[in-house]
Regions:
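Alpha-helical transmembrane segments
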Residues: 42-58, 104-110, 167-172, 332
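Extracellular/periplasmic helix-loop-helix junctions in multi-pass membrane proteins
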Residues: 261-269, 338-355
Length: 377
């Protein structure tokens, strides 16, 4: 039996670990500690949807009380979500470095949206909105999981890469086919073009997605146990970041539940929407923080400083800096929310295509501004 920490048996170590809280600093492997957006605990709940616990709780809320509260939350977060995208573009001056991606193509999208709307192509617009939303939300999960994966040096192997990509894309495909099979007539109350391939293929793809995700977690668990080798006391190396598989788990639960249940009750689509918006706001805020913020706060659980006075001063300084940054970050999300409220209040017919076009522009921009090229611009 393998010995850990200079003489502790693996069975003895396992019996001791439950007494240490999951998010305690001493429970975080050294290789993992520098690769969180904020901290292990915060990332678990906000970036990873509580590893799907939050998603299941939201579904329970709809079953017990309806979707009134969730609908209001979705409206607020969706507009803040759009504003966060504009904040990222302006803060990084992408309108100057990448004019085609952030100016010309969004302008073309708006013009086409207006043309389709004025031409009565509402079914086409609804269809685009449906399929683009699936792609956009799924790719966001991929991007957040990639953040953790690259922090550990990238995929462990070709097998890891294939299993990981399949665990993201297959639930997306299965969700689309399930929704179009169960609700071929309407999407969010509007007619659309359903991608129907038949019940047999739909359920085959669904079963394949479930088995693929199970295979990903089985391989990840096995790999993590094999790689968890203690080099010296207190220094444990891992090669697969837990944030990666937390995101994959939340992604699978979100798509597997929201689109299947959403076929009979559109309210369940709000669960995925709210999860997506919270994750995006959290990620964009974390990425917008100055580099100095990350040096001592990414784990969120540093050892106590011996001198309590120094610790108190440092904590106060960090809080003040965080508050200033949060205020700056909130400007564009608040502007976006205020604009949406004003548009709804004026109720002008010509603004309706602008809202749809703005959504399509957001989908496009989110796929462009978080690439390596954009981040290095």
């Amino acid at each position: 039996m393998e010995l850990l920490n200079g003489g502790t048996k693996e069975s003895d170590w396992s019996s001791l670990r439950p007494s240490i809280p999951l998010f305690h600093y001493s429970n975080i492997p050294v290789a993992e500690r520098g690769h969180w957006l904020f901290s292990r605990r915060a990332d678990f709940w906000l970036a990873c949807g509580g590893a799907s616990i939050g998603l299941l709780a939201a579904i329970l809320l709809i079953l017990l009380r309806g979707d009134r509260e969730l609908d209001a939350i979705d409206f607020v977060l969706s507009e803040l979500h759009l504003g966060a995208t504009y904040h990222a573009i302006i803060r990084r001056r992408l309108w100057h470095h990448r004019r085609v991606d952030v100016l010309l193509i969004p302008l073309a999208i708006l013009m086409l949206t207006y043309a389709f709307s004025l031409g009565g192509q509402t079914i086409l617009l609804t269809s685009i909105a449906m399929y683009a939303a699936v792609w956009h939300r799924g790719r966001q999960s991929l991007g957040v999981a990639r953040f953790y994966q690259r922090g550990m040096g990238g995929p462990v192997s070709r097998t890891h890469e294939v299993l990981f990509c399949g665990a993201i894309y297959l639930p997306m495909l299965a969700a689309v086919l399930a929704y179009t099979q169960l609700a071929p007539g309407e999407y969010e109350g509007e007619p659309y073009v359903a991608l129907s391939v038949g019940a047999e293929i739909t359920w085959t793809v669904g079963l394949g997605a479930v088995l693929w995700v199970i295979a990903y977690f089985a391989w990840t668990l096995r790999q993590s146990r094999a790689d968890r080798v203690t080099l010296t006391p207190g220094k444990t190396e891992i090669r697969i970041h837990p944030g990666e598989w937390w995101v994959v788990l939340a992604h699978g639960v979100a798509f597997g539940s929201s689109y299947v249940l959403g076929a009979s009750n559109v309210s369940f689509l709000l669960v995925l929407a709210v999860h997506h918006e919270v994750q995006y706001l959290y990620f964009t805020y974390a990425m917008s923080r100055p580099a100095g913020f990350h040096d001592g706060s990414r784990t969120g659980m540093e050892p106590a400083i011996n001198r309590s006075g120094v610790q108190s001063i440092e904590t106060r300084r960090r809080f003040q800096a965080e508050l200033r940054h949060a205020t700056t970050f909130a400007v564009w999300p608040v502007i976006g929310f205020a604009g949406a409220c004003a548009g709804g209040w004026f109720d002008l017919a010509w603004l309706a295509p602008l809202g749809t076009g703005g959504l399509f522009c957001h989908y496009w921009l989110d796929g462009r501004i978080w690439t390596r090229r954009s981040l290095n611009a």
